[in-house]
């Protein structure tokens, strides 16, 4: 199906940290129907995320940090276990994720592998996230001082099978982290896959 967007009107609703717009537009389908729609769109820029993994040790590095939206939506502590991530600041996704890995985990990773791109909440948010992975080694740990400004971050290194168990039992609820761990299960730790019985 193809659609055509016409008569777009945009109204700025908020410009605090990011921009919230209200769009009014006509949506025409290839069958000839036309419907006026109104949508609020939150523009927070694009981001990047990375899974640090050590195949030999069978471990991954995640971070735990306070996330107010999760607190508002029922996470009693507001703390979220997740993969390192950050917003692009007029730099490339690769440069962004190297910087974020250093700032949030203390690991200096040079060789990063781009895995894929995904819109994380396309019903209302513009953000496109670039997903990466990098193999880490203990000698790449440059500092234990992590986080910038007012971030509350703890670095968590754990066995890969424990991370998968935390997805299954609900201790890991972050979408990007679940996607990265499942990718790693298929591509980096295939022995963790359980054979299906017929």
Swiss-Prot record:
Cofactor: Mg(2+)
Residues annotated as binding GDP-alpha-D-mannose: 38-40, 67, 85-87, 104, 127, 150-151, 176
CDD domains recorded: NUDIX_GDPMK
Residue ranges crossing the lipid bilayer per the database entry: none
Catalysis: reaction(s): GDP-alpha-D-mannose + H2O = alpha-D-mannose 1-phosphate + GMP + 2 H(+)
Positions with a binding annotation for Mg(2+) 1: 85, 104
Domain of life where this protein originates: Bacteria
MF-aspect GO terms: hydrolase activity, acting on acid anhydrides, in phosphorus-containing anhydrides; metal ion binding
A GO CC term assigned to this protein in UniProt: cytosol
One annotated GO biological process: nucleoside phosphate metabolic process
Name the record gives this protein: GDP-mannose pyrophosphatase
